[in-house]
């Protein structure tokens, strides 16, 4: 597992939780991105990394898709 090179930003509230939940489920970042793309999210690895790192704003579609993949409510991503 790679160590995060940069500290977390403050552009969104969900990035850390997405990263934590994804890792708890043993899903690799590249596999998670593929699932998001399959579900209609136009996202690339750099953009996804910035999302988890809280370095960019998360769209409503991304939050919805992530919640579905992780089988959690959207509200859970904000806790």
Segments (PLM) and residue ranges:
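A short, Lys/Arg-rich alpha-helix, primarily the initiator
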Residues: 1-25
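Helix-turn-helix DNA-binding elements, focusing on the entry/boundary residues of the two helices
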Residues: 18, 29, 45, 60-63
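Short polybasic/polar patches that bind polyanions
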Residues: 23, 37, 68
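Short alpha-helical DNA-recognition segment
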Residues: 26-50
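DNA major-groove recognition helix of helix-turn-helix/homeodomain DNA-binding modules
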Residues: 59-76
């Amino acid at each position: 597992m790679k160590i995060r090179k940069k500290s977390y930003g403050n552009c969104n509230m969900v990035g850390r939780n997405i990263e934590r939940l994804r890792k708890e489920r043993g899903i690799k970042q590249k596999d998670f991105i593929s699932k998001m793309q399959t579900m209609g999210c136009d996202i690339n690895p750099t953009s996804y990394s910035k999302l988890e790192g809280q370095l960019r704003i998360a769209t409503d579609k991304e939050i919805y898709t992530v919640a579905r993949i992780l089988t959690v409510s959207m509200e859970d991503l904000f806790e």
